[in-house]
């Protein structure tokens, strides 16, 4: 699925990052915490995208593409910096907020690889745009009796 954006209106930071994404082996890492940790949603999403899930996906990604660069998106960038071992190969995208938030999804869509959160934002970032070499998604999408939604291509990797 193609997604067109008028890139002439992008900020300098986004233009530079987009250029890097398109010219190298970049993998987006999306971590959603915020509202998922609130009392309203905690019982539905707790234990789905665990630290172990991200660690296993990162390990696999580093093995299949040793030159990979990670482009991190999160509503809790500090947690990502403190908990995920990314070394010096990471960019932490913390400048798109408010009406610019959809630009994060666009940047995700341009990466060759992706490590998704259990989030439709992640899903569309993975599904749209550039052809992906590998996408990781959590085997547990939510704490609901219906299991995984039937939306994942066979080429994506469940962890």
Label the model's feature ranges.
Residues 138-139, 153:
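Proline-rich low-complexity regions
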Residues 44, 140-141:
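Residue-level detector of alpha-helical recognition elements and their boundaries
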Residues 9, 40, 107, 155-156:
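Solvent-exposed, flexible loop/coil residues
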Residues 40-43, 84, 147-149:
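Short aromatic-enriched loop/helix-cap "lid" or pocket-rim segments at secondary-structure transitions
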Residues 144-159:
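Leloir-type glycosyltransferase catalytic cores
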